[in-house]
Amino acid sequence: MRYRYFAGVLVAAVLLLPAQGLAQHVVGTPALTDGSDGGFQVPLNTDPIYRLPTGRAGDSGFYTAAEFVMLTQTRDFGSQTIAVRGFFDSAGALTGVPGLFVGSGTEALNTRDLSRQSYQPGFNVEIGYRFDNGMRLFFNYMQLIETHASLGATLVPPLFRGPSGLADSFLTAPVFNFPPNFAGPARKVAGFGDYQVYGIWNGASTMDIRIAQRYQEMNAGYRIPLLETDYSRIYGAAGGRFAWFFERFQWWTASYDLDGNLQPQFAARYTNTLSQRMYGPFLGCGHEIFILNQFSLSTDLTAAMLFDVAKIRAKYQLGDNVPADISTQSKFGREEFRIVPNLNAAVNLWWYPVEGVQIRVGYQALMFFNTLHMNEPVGFNYGNIDPSYKVKEFRLLHGFNAGIGFFF
């Protein structure tokens, strides 16, 4: 009877006294970092509980992410004089020598004066699927909003200064070999007869130049875990990449007549477009470390060998709304092909506020080698347009990103 009593007391003590369970977190050890599900687990916020339709980041399933990016790239083109102040006495009416220049010849418009750098806002979206073993299939797309820089010159020189006769109130560019459609107004300079100052670009009133740039990138591939511990993981990535640099230079010229009137056929437009689409495989790796409760820091590096298809297009044409019977244009185009090495690097700080939600902010740099750039965007020979392009050894886009992702 005595033994039965002690046995009953022992059983009650085992059942009622608190003990450590397998699902309990012991003070001093990181929660949910045992890697038992095959992926890196950042501690989750369980107090309070948010009823969101998301899953755990370590579980298999679909995920999606969107972020804002703000990147900058330099505008690299050479120094080319577009226009000077004065005009050519094309008929020799004033100077007695056809083609002699009248005026100071002071530079009025040069491509080097365009803004060399600006930030481009944009977005990056990604969708993918995560498997139980930690491997991910993904597709992402980044688009930067087109950015512009412009510059202009008019008939008013700085402080109204210039030689007597007001020759510097006219702008001239050395365009030649153009058809009569681009003759411009019959009379635009006082004291000269009809077409004695010949051509829209000779003795013009206003000129404007503008450069536009944009960038797009797409990646499709997979990411696999390589090495994991309770506090960090190393992973590899591979796939295909598409990158696209688009640049367009535009130049508008307006030549008013002697009475200050502007007809559609008295204006001309020049356009130079450089489009570089690049395709190729990429290979990379990344490292993520747990630094604080719900926070981690990651670094990523990918290298790609891209095949660049560069399309070059340049065109002279009359202004808008020109009658069809006098409308004309001159076109130039060619393609170039080259190999462009590419290196992308990123550093991101991650925050995991609730299950299935990830927020990150970071910095990224996109480096390209052996791309083309406009050295002298304008070819002044209307009949044989030949702008100058050169190889740019190094091109850099860099800036910041911030976004959010969801696991389902």
PLM regions with names:
Residues M70-T74, Y141-I145, G240-F246, A303-K311, ...:
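Transmembrane beta-strands of outer-membrane beta-barrel pores
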Residues F62-A66, M135-F139, I234-G240, P281-L283, ...:
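Transmembrane beta-strands of outer-membrane beta-barrel proteins
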Residues M70, F394-F408:
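Outer-membrane beta-barrel "beta-signal"
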Residues A23-A65, I224:
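Outer-membrane beta-barrel biogenesis signature
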Residues F62, P121-V125, Q216-A220, Y279-L283, ...:
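Hydrophobic, lipid-facing positions within transmembrane beta-strands of outer-membrane proteins
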Residues Q276-Q358, L366-F368:
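Extended serine/threonine-enriched, polar tracts that run as long, contiguous segments within proteins
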Residues F77-R85, A91-S118, I145-R214, F245-R277, ...:
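Extracellular/periplasm-exposed beta-strand and loop segments of Gram-negative cell-envelope proteins
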Residues G58, F131-N133, L226-D230, I289-N293, ...:
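Outer-membrane beta-barrel strand-turn architecture
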